[in-house]
Amino acid sequence: MTRLTLALDAMGGDFGPCVTVPAALQALASNPALNLLLVGDPAAITPLLAKVDSDLLSRLEVVPAESVIASDARPSQAIRASRGTSMRIALELIKDGRAQACVSAGNTGALMGLAKLLIKPLEGIERPALVSVLPHQQHGKTVVLDLGANVDCDSTMLVQFAVMGSVMAEEVLELKNPRVALLNIGEEESKGLSTIREAAAQLKEAPSINYIGYLEGNDLLTGKTDVMVCDGFVGNVTLKTVEGVVRMFLSLLKSPASGPGQKQKRSWWLKWLGRLLQKRLSKRFGHLNPDQYNGACLLGLRGTVIKSHGAANQRAFAVAIEQAMQTVRRQLPDRIAARLEAVLPKSD
């Protein structure tokens, strides 16, 4: 199996090395062909490696970084002061050819800006988009973008997102002629912002895109479309709302609510029935757990950059690492570039 080397921004996210280092070790243990470059403060990282097996340590290198970009820093300021930060160094490792992908749970705006500066967008792409693959109720998956990289999007950007999402659905989900929809406040053609209506008009005329029209937020997990396109503001709010609802639902399955108005004593058969239902429902809906699809790819770059949730736990960050590996092995940037050349106009 071909060896892979990934760079991890070990200091990014809400929990920094406390999550990223154990997740890195988990990924190394599961993937013998994986090497990792942990970028960050050695004083914070090294103690977490004290009891690690020598085989894992042989495939791990700590790359020192002087500082970290704060999660609440303004992207423009963060980029100007980014030299020496763990995020920038991790991206530079891709640029210099030492790593094939980067994973960070840090500041989204800064990651977007630095990735565009250092890795460069593909020909014909104005701005990369954050994209993730979400499960739906038909036991399939839906490509959703943009999830927060671009708050303001014009119609041209939405069309580019549609093309990239369609290519990803074909290459990653192996779908033929994937359905593409625009997320809107209604399915009527007159609904929505002018940018959405203009994008719809362009997509209708694009022979390479199987555009099916507008869909609403409640259609996201129904399987009505293979690709859902929206601007980054709407996408981020939608994603986090869905994740919040799913987490609440799964927590209720594990521990049914009880309160002053509810009887605490139940017969043995009711307790048995409750546990049985919890187990079956948890198994039935467990695939919706947001931790299992953490990690959004910055689609449209010449390299692979994965953005993890800032609040990701060890399991979720390990999933983001796995996604980076899959993206590299599928050569997604190269395959998308080849398709984009045929369907998008080249930039000046």
Curated annotation (Swiss-Prot):
Keywords tagged on the record: Cytoplasm, Lipid biosynthesis, Lipid metabolism, Phospholipid biosynthesis, Phospholipid metabolism, Transferase
Catalytically driven reaction(s): a fatty acyl-[ACP] + phosphate = an acyl phosphate + holo-[ACP]
GO biological process annotation, one example: fatty acid biosynthetic process
Domain of life: Bacteria
Enzyme Commission number, as recorded: 2.3.1.274
Enzyme class: transferase
Functional pathway: Lipid metabolism; phospholipid metabolism
Subcellular location: Cytoplasm
Predominant location category: cytoplasm
A GO term for molecular function: phosphate:acyl-[acyl carrier protein] acyltransferase activity
Function of the protein: Catalyzes the reversible formation of acyl-phosphate (acyl-PO(4)) from acyl-[acyl-carrier-protein] (acyl-ACP). This enzyme utilizes acyl-ACP as fatty acyl donor, but not acyl-CoA.
HAMAP family: PlsX
Assembly, per entry: Homodimer. Probably interacts with PlsY.
The protein, known as: Phosphate acyltransferase
